[in-house]
Amino acid sequence: MSHTMTPSEIVSELDKHIIGQNKAKKAVAVALRNRWRRQQVAEPLRQEITPKNILMIGPTGVGKTEIARRLAKLADAPFIKIEATKFTEVGYVGRDVDTIVRDLAEMAIKQTRESEMKKVRTKAEDAAEDRLLDVLLPPPRDIGFSQPEEKDSNTRQVFRKKLREGQLDDKDIELEVSAGMPSMDIMGPPGMEDMTEQIRTMFAGLGQGKKARRKMKVKEAFKLLIDEEAAKLVNDEELKHKAIANVEQNGIVFLDEIDKIASRSDIGGGEVSRQGVQRDLLPLVEGTTVNTKYGMIKTDHILFIASGAFHLSKPSDLIPELQGRFPIRVELESLSVQDFEAILTQTDASLTKQYQALLNTEEVNLVFAPDGIRRLAEIAFSVNEKVENIGARRLYTVMERLLEDLSFHASKSSGETVTIDAAYVEERLGDLAGNEDLSRYVL
């Protein structure tokens, strides 16, 4: 979807879910569009055009991760979000950075398989239908006469019609289906994920080709047979090549909490592993070849988007080589009272809409007055300023506290309309917001 969208269309799509942060939205929109532009450039220049990686800097709760989440849905491309803190330097106990590309490859295989199976779904449905009809109506043994065949064909058409209309959905049938090996969870030591995955794949392959008879409803059997027939129609080798090409040309990696692996200039010692992770990330970001079970994957054209709050460290605390690999820097602003108001009312799945929908299930009609919204925004902003700035996440705490009693007694208020105005908010949250000691623990 994203490759046909212009940067302004991508920003409009992000605006539905994220308030403000236009610089960050512009940067990711241009980066996404540049993937498409690069594909239109002729070789050999196309190979020379590498993605410009992005570093998003801003306090927690202002939309860094949300931009990544929404981008993942927009980008019709392999996408993975990982925490930089999960990785350790090669040789230490923990995951090494090559697993990023392996996980991305797994994601691409799954994505490509789903896409290929959708393409052959109609054929798979026809084949599954025939297999079901063979079970429901076994073919006649005596094939010497044409009349029974004709009669059987008519009966088959009647059953086919019933099957399509769902009249046979609850009928029990016995069916021969592929018997996979029972799923086996192998616990491996930290840092040995690759070997563990290979052992798991080896055991999974042992059950291939075996059949087993199972009793089930027609509806369940139809779904199972569609998947089986679609899997037969998909060429695994071709799928693998497509997935690898998709990772190499369109892959996006979102590196969260990158500030946590930055070595602070004012602290000495204990920083070896952090710098080591940065040095391990470096070849991955600038372009290297990683060995995966699906083949070799080049990372030259994978887009990396890193983000961090940088409270205790600065972007300049990252090693110079890594800094140079993130040429686009975007600063995200802290949220204002107006931003909080917009978050509560303007986004597609705003908190107010969520609570209205939840309480509507108990026939409680929740109405948010503009002055009530304003007061909620002021309280969230005030607590963030006084206690700890956790951005938009503060609204979850404030809203839960505000509607706690109403949610608890909702069944008793069935059929009522409750208006959340400034007085209602003040009555339930005013004292807490004003008392810094109380708000520190409660809000």
Swiss-Prot record:
Span list, region Disordered: 139-158
SUPFAM superfamilies named among the record's database cross-references: P-loop containing nucleoside triphosphate hydrolases
Pfam families per UniProt: AAA, AAA_2
Domain of life per record: Bacteria
Chief place where the protein resides: cytoplasm
Record GO biological process: protein unfolding; proteolysis involved in protein catabolic process
Protein keywords: ATP-binding, Chaperone, Cytoplasm, Nucleotide-binding
Location within or outside the cell: Cytoplasm
Amino acids binding ATP: I19, G61, V62, G63, K64, T65, E66, D256, E321, R393
Cellular component terms (Gene Ontology): HslUV protease complex
NCBIfam families per record: hslU (TIGR00390), PRK05201.1 (NF003544)
Assembly and interaction partners: A double ring-shaped homohexamer of HslV is capped on each side by a ring-shaped HslU homohexamer. The assembly of the HslU/HslV complex is dependent on binding of ATP.
Protein purpose: ATPase subunit of a proteasome-like degradation complex; this subunit has chaperone activity. The binding of ATP and its subsequent hydrolysis by HslU are essential for unfolding of protein substrates subsequently hydrolyzed by HslV. HslU recognizes the N-terminal part of its protein substrates and unfolds these before they are guided to HslV for hydrolysis.
Record-stated family: Belongs to the ClpX chaperone family. HslU subfamily.
HAMAP family associated with the record: HslU (MF_00249)
Name assigned to this protein: ATP-dependent protease ATPase subunit HslU
